Design a protein with these regions (language model features):
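Glycine- and other small-residue-rich loops at beta-strand/loop junctions that grip anionic moieties
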Residues: 20, 42-44, 84-87, 119, ...
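Active-site core of metal-dependent hydrolases
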Residues: 114-181
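Short coil/turn connectors at secondary-structure junctions
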Residues: 2, 6-8, 37, 60-66, ...
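Conserved mixed alpha/beta catalytic, RNA-binding, or beta-rich assembly cores of soluble enzyme
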Residues: 14, 46-47, 172-175
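Short secondary-structure boundary/capping elements
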Residues: 20-24, 90-94, 122, 149, ...
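Active-site gating loops and adjacent loop-to-helix segments of metal-dependent hydrolytic enzymes
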Residues: 2, 8-9, 34-38, 70-88, ...
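Divalent-metal coordination cores built from histidine and acidic residues
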Residues: 29-115
Length: 181
C-alpha cells in the first residue's frame, strides 16, 4: 500500500452510461469505474418506453452501481434528435408507473430544458408536465437550466424547483452560470 492511495469510491451525479449507439452513450465500467467512480447517476438516458431494456442491458450488466434520473421524455436520450421534439412524448402516467415499479433504481426525473432539447416548444410548458410528474411520483427533479438563449430568467426557473431538486449544467460562464469569468 505504500505506493498506492486508498480512496472511497466516488459518486458522479451526472453521466450518460448507455449503449454507445445512443445519443450520449458511454461505457460506465470502462470510463468511470476505471477512474474511481463506483456509483453513477444517469441523467435521463432512458425514459419510460425503454427503461426495461436499459435496466437489463446496462444496469444489470455493469460492475458500477447505476441509478437513473428517468427522462421525462418517453424514449430518453436513445435517439439522435431533441429529447422533447414531440410534446406528446411526455407521458406523465406512464412515467409515474415506471418509477413506481422501480423506485430504488430510479432516484429522480431528468429534464434538460436547453434549447437543443426543447426543440420548438416553450420550456415552461415542458416544465409544467415535469413538475406534475415529480409530484405524482414523489421524486426530485434533476434539472438542466435554460440559459442560452436567455429567454427565461434563471430566478423564474429556480422558483419552480422544490426542496431536494438538483440543478445541473450550472458551472459555466454567462447568464446564470456559476463559473468565474
Amino acid at each position: 500500500l505504500s505506493q498506492r492511495t486508498l480512496l472511497p469510491g466516488f459518486i458522479d451525479l451526472h453521466t450518460h452510461p448507455a449503449p454507445s449507439h445512443w445519443k450520449y452513450g458511454m461505457e460506465a465500467d470502462r470510463f468511470l469505474l476505471s477512474r474511481g467512480t463506483t456509483t453513477t447517476m444517469s441523467q435521463g438516458d432512458a425514459g419510460s418506453n425503454n427503461w426495461d431494456k436499459y435496466k437489463k442491458a446496462i444496469i444489470q450488466k455493469s460492475k458500477i452501481d447505476i441509478y437513473m434520473a428517468l427522462s421525462a421524455a418517453n424514449n430518453g436520450e436513445e435517439y439522435d434528435h431533441p429529447v422533447f421534439e414531440s410534446f406528446e412524448d411526455i407521458d406523465i402516467n406512464q412515467a409515474v408507473e415506471t418509477i413506481k415499479n422501480d423506485p430504488k433504481l430510479i432516484w429522480g426525473i431528468s429534464a434538460n430544458l436547453s434549447e437543443a432539447c426543447t426543440y420548438i416548444h416553450k420550456p415552461q410548458n415542458i416544465m409544467s408536465k415535469v413538475l406534475e410528474m415529480a409530484e405524482k411520483s414523489s421524486k426530485p427533479i434533476l434539472y438542466g437550466m435554460r440559459w442560452e438563449p436567455f429567454d427565461w430568467e434563471i430566478k423564474d426557473q429556480l422558483a419552480l424547483l422544490r426542496p431536494n431538486d438538483v440543478v445541473t449544467y450550472c458551472f459555466h460562464v454567462g447568464p446564470g452560470g456559476l463559473a468565474p469569468k
